[in-house]
UniProtKB/Swiss-Prot annotation:
Its cofactor is Mg(2+). Binds 1 Mg(2+) ion per subunit. One of its GO terms (biological process) is nucleotide metabolic process. Pyrophosphatase that catalyzes the hydrolysis of nucleoside triphosphates to their monophosphate derivatives, with a high preference for the non-canonical purine nucleotides XTP (xanthosine triphosphate), dITP (deoxyinosine triphosphate) and ITP. Seems to function as a house-cleaning enzyme that removes non-canonical purine nucleotides from the nucleotide pool, thus preventing their incorporation into DNA/RNA and avoiding chromosomal lesions. It comes from Chlamydia caviae (strain ATCC VR-813 / DSM 19441 / 03DC25 / GPIC) (Chlamydophila caviae). Homodimer. This is dITP/XTP pyrophosphatase. One of its GO terms (cellular component) is cytosol. Substrate binds at S7, C8, H9, G10, Y11, K12, T71, F154, G155, Y156, D157, K177, H182, R183. PANTHER family: INOSINE TRIPHOSPHATE PYROPHOSPHATASE (PTHR11067:SF9), INOSINE TRIPHOSPHATE PYROPHOSPHATASE/HAM1 PROTEIN (PTHR11067). It catalyses: XTP + H2O = XMP + diphosphate + H(+); dITP + H2O = dIMP + diphosphate + H(+); ITP + H2O = IMP + diphosphate + H(+). One of its GO terms (molecular function) is dITP diphosphatase activity.
């Protein structure tokens, strides 16, 4: 069964591809395989809105089942920021390091783990060319370190520590992170729908 991961981000593609391969025989593609495809601009205030818009658009344009996701980092002490600005927190043209630097600056006066609490919220949508979709949500709670640690991952990974873990997401191995992350939790909830699609395809072939 053909399925397209609606992302050009290497880490997201790897994590999702690893998960899909564990489920069954998917022919897996990503947006890097469709250089002429133009994704819609993210304008939603919630991960669910952006993931759904991306998924439905890509599924229709590429005539394929699609997996799309959107993730936001929320810091309650900052009234939910970065939130919908997670990808542009330090500006439209800023890089991940700039966003992390701004977050640390905004949290300078916050010292306790309670005050520095944060969580990632991820919504993943499985969408069909006909407009049918399934969605799942994953949350990972933790707190923001007072300095960057680790060189793996992307985004805010080098600042985020999951509760009960002593390493940031950027210090964890991909295998470990892929079991406990917000994206992993959302993907696991989608597993029954994906397996059902595979079973239906096998039946139709026979």
């Amino acid at each position: 069964m053909k399925i397209v991961i609606a992302s050009c981000h290497g880490y997201k593609i790897r994590e999702t591809k690893t998960f899909l391969k564990q489920l069954g025989s998917f022919d897996i593609f990503s947006l890097t395989d469709f250089p002429n495809y133009s994704a819609p601009k993210e304008i939603g205030c919630l991960p669910e809105e952006n993931a759904l818009a991306k998924g439905l658009h890509a599924a229709k344009e590429l005539n394929s089942w699609v997996i799309a996701d959107d993730t936001m980092l929320m810091v309650p002490a900052l009234n939910g920021l970065p939130g919908k600005l997670s990808a542009t927190f330090a500006g439209e043209d800023a890089c991940d390091k700039d966003h992390r630097k701004k977050l640390l600056q905004e949290m300078q006066s916050l010292e306790s783990i309670v005050d520095r609490s944060a969580y990632f919220e991820c919504c993943i949508v499985l969408a069909s060319p006909e407009g049918k979709f399934f969605k799942a949500r994953g949350i990972c709670e933790g707190y923001i370190s007072n300095q960057e640690k680790g060189s793996s991952g992307f985004g805010y990974d080098s600042l985020f520590l999951k509760y009960d873990y002593k390493q940031t997401f950027a210090e964890l191995s991909e295998d470990v992170k892929n079991q406990v992350s917000h994206r992993a939790k959302a993907l696991q909830k989608l597993a029954p729908y994906l397996q059902n699609l595979l079973e239906k395809q096998l039946v139709s072939r026979n």
